[in-house]
């Protein structure tokens, strides 16, 4: 085995940083840039409620299905090439959505985007593990912060761009970042794996690894944590404005500002949480903070919504700090590249697989009871569900260690 050229390693890592940042930005901006433009799009062609409902359901569905398939794609085509195809699908979908001539074209473009995002979500922790195994906390901070920025930025500027240049430009402008992100991954995909980066685990991937995740407590704990974070986030993005209007008596405009506050709370968490987990080993205290905040936030909206809606929303928005915690833990709770991909795929596909029923389930429950009591109680229960998962993750065992203790050699 030849010794890697230090200059080639350095260049590979620089390309990887740029690629990871642009990938992370595209994974969230593609999701967050559409809904503010429905009114503007509706002036050009009809947007049936059924199609809008499908567009709202497609993201978690695609994240679950394609997250499940991502490990197989990576085994077959390799990490860089799979990343390249996923990001290409996002870029192509953004262009297709901007060029849509009817609601079904919009749906097709969105489905293509979310399929790429579903695969990309799984691959990002594996990319960090491969290229920056000794800097997992730092790189996770970089890309989760990028994700946080690209979540709240598009809704803020989508309408102004549409007013100035049209809704097609407002949708299509985000494709620039996806296309730019293709460049480093093309270079890294073409380069030999042996020369792409140092300290890379190149063992032959095993098709059995993903199947083992179903039998490991840490894998299930991460899946439950991912579900708790994504369920609260997606339910809030879908229903929090209406909950606030109905229960706290705020105006729709104020409710929109409060929803932005909910999203903005994730930014400081993305800056701090990965470092606390990777460098300090702080895990269970973060779970306690997140769980307690979720209980207090949903509980406040339940028993005294009008007294301090800003406080309740800020508290509820604290629970998704579990998202960067999960992404950091995926790299820290594995020894091998293959296990990292499998664990990321398992946690995200299971988490999103259950989450996709939350927004529509909350809507059905509200219609059946004509009240927000039951949905808020469910959010309290989900917040509490994270605590036992935190106890398991705090044990600091890798999935390989768990398997070896229970079943013998990995």
Predicted region positions:
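Cytoplasmic helix-loop-helix junction between adjacent transmembrane helices
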Residues: 109-147
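Juxtamembrane intracellular "pre-TM" segments in multi-pass secondary transporters
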Residues: 2-10, 190-222
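A late C-terminal transmembrane helix in Major Facilitator Superfamily
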Residues: 334-372, 379
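Helix-loop-helix hairpin linking two adjacent transmembrane segments in secondary transporters
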Residues: 134-135, 142-193
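Extracytoplasmic gate region of multi-pass secondary transporters
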Residues: 34-35, 217-260, 267-268
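Helix-breaking motifs and short loop linkers at transmembrane-helix boundaries and internal kinks
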Residues: 46, 78, 99-104, 133, ...
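Conserved MFS/SLC helix-loop-helix module at the cytosolic interface between two early adjacent transmembrane helices
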Residues: 65-104
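C-terminal transmembrane helical hairpin of 12-TM major facilitator-type secondary transporters
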Residues: 283-326
């Amino acid at each position: 085995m030849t010794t890697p050229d230090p200059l080639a390693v350095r260049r590979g890592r620089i390309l990887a940083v740029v690629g990871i940042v642009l990938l992370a930005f595209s994974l969230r901006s593609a999701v967050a840039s559409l809904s503010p433009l429905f009114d503007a799009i509706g002036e050009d062609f009809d947007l049936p409620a059924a199609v809008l409902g499908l567009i709202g359901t497609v993201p978690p569905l695609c994240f679950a299905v394609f997250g499940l398939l991502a490990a197989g794609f990576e085994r077959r085509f390799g990490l860089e090439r799979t990343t390249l195809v996923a990001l290409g699908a996002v870029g192509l979908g953004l262009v297709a959505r901007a060029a849509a001539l009817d609601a079904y074209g919009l749906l097709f473009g969105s489905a293509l985007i979310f399929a790429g995002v579903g695969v990309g979500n799984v691959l990002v922790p594996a990319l960090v593990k491969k290229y920056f195994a000794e800097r997992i906390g730092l790189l996770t901070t970089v890309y989760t912060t990028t994700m946080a920025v690209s979540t709240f930025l598009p809704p803020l500027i989508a309408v102004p761009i549409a007013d100035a240049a049209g809704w097609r430009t407002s949708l299509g402008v985000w494709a620039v970042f996806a296309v730019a992100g293709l460049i480093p991954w093309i270079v890294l995909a073409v380069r030999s794996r042996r020369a792409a980066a140092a300290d890379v685990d190149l063992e032959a991937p095993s098709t059995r690894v993903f199947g083992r995740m179903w039998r490991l407590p840490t894998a299930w704990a991460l899946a439950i944590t991912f579900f708790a974070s994504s369920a609260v986030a997606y339910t809030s993005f879908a229903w929090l404005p209406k909950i606030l209007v109905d229960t706290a008596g705020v105006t729709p405009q104020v409710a929109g500002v409060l929803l932005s506050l909910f999203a903005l709370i994730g930014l400081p968490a993305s800056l701090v949480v990965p470092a606390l987990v990777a460098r300090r080993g702080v895990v269970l205290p973060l779970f306690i903070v997140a769980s307690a905040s979720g209980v207090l936030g949903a509980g406040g909206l339940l028993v005294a919504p009008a007294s301090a809606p800003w406080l309740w929303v800020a508290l509820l928005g604290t629970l998704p700090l579990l998202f960067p915690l999960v992404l950091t833990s995926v790299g820290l709770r594995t020894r091998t590249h293959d296990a990292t991909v499998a664990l990321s795929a398992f946690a995200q596909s299971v988490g999103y697989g259950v989450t996709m029923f939350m927004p529509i389930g909350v809507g059905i429950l509200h219609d059946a009871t004509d009240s927000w009591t039951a949905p808020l109680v469910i959010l309290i229960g989900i917040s509490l569900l994270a605590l036992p998962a935190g106890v398991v993750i705090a044990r600091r065992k890798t999935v390989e260690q768990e398997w070896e203790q229970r079943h013998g050699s990995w």
